[in-house]
Amino acid sequence: MTSHLKKVELHCHLEGAAPPALTEAQARKYGIDMSEQLRDGAYVWHDFASFLECYDKVSEVYKTEEDYALLTETYLDELAAINTIYSELIVSPDHGKRIGLGADAYISGVCEGIRRAKEKSGIEARLIVTGERHFGPDSVIGAAEYAAKAGNPLITGFNLAGEERMGRVADYSRAFDIARDAGLGLTIHAGEVCGAFSVADALDAVRPARIGHGVRAIEDLDLVKRLADLGTVLEVCPGSNIALRVYPDFASHPLRRLKEAGVPVTISSDDPPFFHTSLEREYALAAEAFGFDNAEIDAMTRTAIEAAFVDAQTRKALLARL
């Protein structure tokens, strides 16, 4: 049983965490037909293309600053209820612009949701601003500049997400230079859709502290050793990897092999309701599917706190809560 364990999440996309019940209420509020994407309280998709369509449709029902405050508060409340003490949320200021809300109002709403949730439960949260590969290097540089100039204490990291097959990591290295110079923590999606080479590219071009997913590194044992030697932390999302058919089943998933090879690994949920999972389920899977005992799971949570993009005082306080 892992329900009593303290939990930490480093890899979760905010819009991808939208609870179906809240999305349904939002759709009614705005008169948006979600019948193709939401049935019997669950999101519906059948392949990667329809997953993206469903994700975009869900995002349509969150339009205002208050909508984003409510979304953030609701998800963090869910996390707090399962003993989560810290969450990093991946957010896109570009998304705020695209929906006509604006980056500042979008981020302001999310920050208000964080404030409300913390007031109730004490849960800590930070924001990881992401650029999206499929919009090209200039867009990603813009996201990095936004994060660097925001002066927002809750924005503590920078990420690159989106279609992994769009260009090489080096095409986006300028954005990471901007974020690094601003003192932001660096993480990057790699080694999910694409193979081990994408993880090697990320290490060469970005030198990130963490990698989102990174599990395909297992296909190159020299790369696995490099990750272990560098201490690069992987934000592993097993339920997501199975749902998107990166691996056919948990028996073939490399989480345990990576950990046993000395790679620092952590557990996250990615886009939980879309993959019919949750952080609670991911922790349970660590025990049930991968055979980790509670001490090993606690060690992964400690790794997550040590790798969190927070100041020393917050890190010390989080470690004290384990």
Curated annotation (Swiss-Prot):
GO biological process per UniProt: adenine catabolic process; hypoxanthine salvage; nucleotide metabolic process
Reactions this protein catalyses: adenine + H2O + H(+) = hypoxanthine + NH4(+)
Cofactor binding note: Binds 1 zinc ion per subunit.
Active site residues of this protein: 192
Stored InterPro entries: A_deaminase_dom, ADE, Ado/ade_deaminase, Metal_Hydrolase
Cross-referenced CDD domains: ADA (cd01320)
Positions bound to Zn(2+): 11, 13, 189, 270
EC number: 3.5.4.2
Residue positions binding substrate: 271
SUPFAM superfamilies registered for this protein in UniProt: Metallo-dependent hydrolases
Pfam family of the protein (one): A_deaminase
One Gene Ontology molecular-function label: zinc ion binding
Its job: Catalyzes the hydrolytic deamination of adenine to hypoxanthine. Plays an important role in the purine salvage pathway and in nitrogen catabolism.
NCBIfam families: aden_deam, PRK09358.1-3
Family: Belongs to the metallo-dependent hydrolases superfamily. Adenosine and AMP deaminases family. Adenine deaminase type 2 subfamily.
HAMAP family: Adenine_deaminase
Protein name in UniProt: Adenine deaminase
